[in-house]
Amino acid sequence: MKIPLLPHTDHLLPKGRAKLTIAQARHIRMVKEALSSNEGFLMAMIDSNREESEITEVPALTTRVQIIDFHRLEGDLLGITVEGIDILRIMKIHVDFDHLLIADCAPYFIWPPFPATSENQYLADKLKQLHATVPDLGELYTEPKYSDMTWVCQRWIEVLPIDGKYKQLLIHQENPKLAIRFLMKLLQDKNLIY
């Protein structure tokens, strides 16, 4: 399947949500096509220290997103809210006539639901706390799934300021067990702000 690709510093995983500002004509075309086809588009993780002009590679795993809301902003900008649908593996990328990236991709597995336990409930509690502290983030989720560690871990992976290659390592796993261990260790570190 061929799907438009948007490299972005906002990292999004299945069931995650983000608000994006779309400015370039090629990306506005991407949004129009995503809305008319119901195929969505891909959001590929790039680290915040990389400029779009220097992107020569994107991670193999990327999230397909659907647009759940949009509105016009000042200055001919477009504001959209997207939600992650699934994970796809990029096989090949080509550049379209207007420099929009188009990816040939194949389905990849997504983590199954994974129930919270007394041992890992700490992660859900800290995420609730983060959502209360950062209302713009918390308001994106009208029905948060704090009892599902897959959902909780994916939200943490999206927001934590860790290198994209480590995020990719975590999402390459067949379930969230490694992510739970990693996040428990990271979030229980007293030097971490959260």
State each model region's role.
Residues M1-Y194:
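N-terminal low-complexity, acidic/polar interaction/targeting segments
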